[in-house]
Amino acid sequence: MLFLSFYAGSWESWICCCCVIPVDRPWDRGRRWQLEMADTRSVYETRFEAAVKVIQSLPKNGSFQPTNEMMLRFYSFYKQATEGPCKLSRPGFWDPIGRYKWDAWSSLGDMTKEEAMIAYVEEMKKIIETMPMTEKVEELLHVIGPFYEIVEDKKNSKSSDLTSDLGNVLTSSNAKAVNGKAESSDSGAESEEEEAQEELKGAEQSGSDDKKMMTKSTDKNLEIIVTNGYKDSFAQDSDIHTDSSRSARRSEDKKPTDQSSQQTGNTVLCVHQDTNEDPGEDASGVHHLTSDSDSEVYCDSMEQFGQEEYYLGGDPAQHLEGSGFCEDAQLSPGNGSIGKMQMRAVKGKGEVKHGGEDGRSSSGTPHREKRGGESEDISGVRRGRGHRMPHLSEGTKGRQVGSGGDGERWGSDRGSRGSLNEQIALVLIRLQEDMQNVLQRLHKLETLTASQAKLSWQTSNQPSSQRPSWWPFEMSPGALAFAIIWPFIAQWLVHLYYQRRRRKLN
């Protein structure tokens, strides 16, 4: 209590100010300690009590019936958590159930109460999924919270490459390129990754490109664009057809060219619409596309197959009419190679030269470079076995278009294609994740089974008593027989002693 005195003017006033200063009393310290202890132990005790309520609320004839071993474990942990280590004597032979319970309880030894509570809750977590959902179970789940472990997938290099790259395909829209050469590997899975990557861009433009398919124009010229940094000029052809009879022979003749083209980018076929082209340049230029593995054009989706029929079947003067749009049609073999042949129809005049600049001159006429008297071998970029373009005939001329080797993909994106490859990629990712989860569960089950087998083997190897299993008494049969016969033998010996004594007296 603190008193303050003030003097004001002609009168004197006393103002009493009471300041209560908190004092750390012993009973307050004890109360705070009890609250802190209640907070710290409430976590384990609350979970333990909720788990005990779940076990006690199980109906006798319910859908979930725990085994005897499971109930013995719960009993032993409950007794250890509530009463501590077992200090009682073992029940007699007339109480076999009590003896089993005593054995389970005493096997825990000096386990603390907190450890017993934790073990009780952990045992409950193993079976909580198989139990019917009741109010007690919901309360236990609310108290425990999320108890599932988040296990990261540990995959080998091949499987991790597949899932990680396919995951990047779904989020990234740009292809990897270094110095004008698309990065590639020898696995067939990466070809599906690049296909799925470009399908996402093609799906967005599917609506607009389908409408442009119906437009018509008059003149058309077929032009080959090689995006590998080399300058190659080819003539045009009025017909694109497939021929499989010469694929084996040409595969042997063009191995050097194929090896050089494997290190380059993608081969693109472009259909240019140019009204000022010289008619003399329209000659036989582009020959057929063949495959090392099969004799047919491989299509990834039904829409692509229909588009390739549109270009490859019938008169090109009818089917290539109205090609005022850009479309990339990927031709990939069935073995998963990612060699890409892009057919592109570009409306207007001009070309793209080395460096990516427009090929038109200042006067508006396209810059042309012609090369005659030589034979060109064009091969699609192959991985393993891929598509190949045979060499062109001698004296072919045409418009050449190249890239500057800067790694950029120029031209329009892939046209409309179906979502078949995208769905396949997603299914593969989910299937692989499910397989990894199944393998992890199987591994856990195997380890659990091995530990249980080891535990049962240890318990079976413990020295058992000499009595048979059917004997109901605690002592052995021989000891019981001796206990029964011993009084008779003792009485007989006493009787013999008295008889001899009487004979001596007589």
Curated annotation (Swiss-Prot):
GO terms for biological process: fatty acid metabolic process; pexophagy. The chain crosses the membrane at residues 478-498. SUPFAM superfamilies: Acyl-CoA binding protein (SSF47027). The modification Phosphoserine is found at residues 184-185, 187, 191, 206, 233, 301, 403. The keyword Acetylation applies. InterPro entries: ACBD5, Acyl-CoA-binding_prot_CS, Acyl-CoA-binding_protein, Acyl-CoA-binding_sf, FERM/acyl-CoA-bd_prot_sf. It comes from the Eukaryota. The modification N6-acetyllysine is found at residue 444. An acyl-CoA binds at residues 55-64, 75-79, 101, 120. Keywords: Acetylation, Autophagy, Coiled coil, Lipid-binding, Membrane, Peroxisome, Phosphoprotein, Transmembrane, Transmembrane helix, Transport. Residues 198-217, 238-257, 348-360, 406-416 have a biased composition (Basic and acidic residues). Its main location: membrane. Residues 175-217, 234-302, 345-417 are annotated as: Disordered. It is a single-pass membrane protein. Residues 44-133 form the ACB domain. GO terms for molecular function: fatty-acyl-CoA binding. Residues 181-209, 426-451 form a coiled coil. Residues 258-267 have a biased composition (Polar residues). It is found in: Peroxisome membrane. PROSITE patterns: ACB_1, ACB_2. Acyl-CoA binding protein which acts as the peroxisome receptor for pexophagy but is dispensable for aggrephagy and nonselective autophagy. Binds medium- and long-chain acyl-CoA esters. Belongs to the ATG37 family. This is Acyl-CoA-binding domain-containing protein 5. It comes from Rattus norvegicus. The gene is Acbd5.
